[in-house]
Amino acid sequence: PEGMPKNNSYWSGYNSIHVVSDATRPMMVHFTREQMLANNITTTGADSDFGILRGDSVGASIDNSQEAYIYQTKVVKQDVTCLNGYIHQVEDVLVPPGNVAQVLRSEKNTKLISRIVDYHSAPYYDATTTANYNSWALQYGQPTIDSIFQMRYFSSRSQGGVPNILTPAGAAIPNSGRLEWDLGWNQYYSSTDAANYLDDMGAILVPTDEAIENYFLPGGEGDFFIELYGAEGLENTKENLPANLDALYNKGNGILTTFVNNMIQTSFVATVPSKFG
């Protein structure tokens, strides 16, 4: 299907498919000065963690303890009292950015790492989502859908904190083919504490397409992987790199899985730039 993983046998059998990216509850991510300071995340200065995370120019900061952000959007007026609650006004329309896998797929310069990550995905029939959708469809006179699938990733930790290590047909995925955690899992929490999804989230250190090209193309530190496991008869060129990565995944006995797992981090709080080294 258009927009779904390429060169992935779990998807290639479908001419069309109804699929959701994840069936767990999306988290609303807040950045507050108090929370950042409590976790030793820098909030002021030219190279502050907050400035880098915001993607702003020099000087980005949270310098007022009352300031807060939801995703990338600033709360400009807060705690407006109403008869039945409070209003918090934000400067832009709030749009959830999607989970890690979705963002990698949508960004213009992360197509190669997204392709590699999606080698580890498969569509799983989701009876609950199918039933919920059809209940809504019947109520509002819309067509029902026979089957809705959920896009999930082979991983040592997935929804509910348990592994997702079986294919849709029930075959076991070896350790060498499992990601550290499911990059499509909206409600991720670390293995140490199921309750800390309210306090922390996962992270991934993502290489751009150019960085991956520099690594795998001739002269890069990983060009020998393509020479050993690349597609037969294809030169190691930029144009051929997607096909060569496909072959490397199929023949490389977990090399690309290890490549991704080296980037995956279990804690955002512990992975901000000021804590490197």
Regions found by a protein language model. Give the residues of each.
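Mature, structured domains of secreted/extracytosolic soluble proteins
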Residues: 1-277
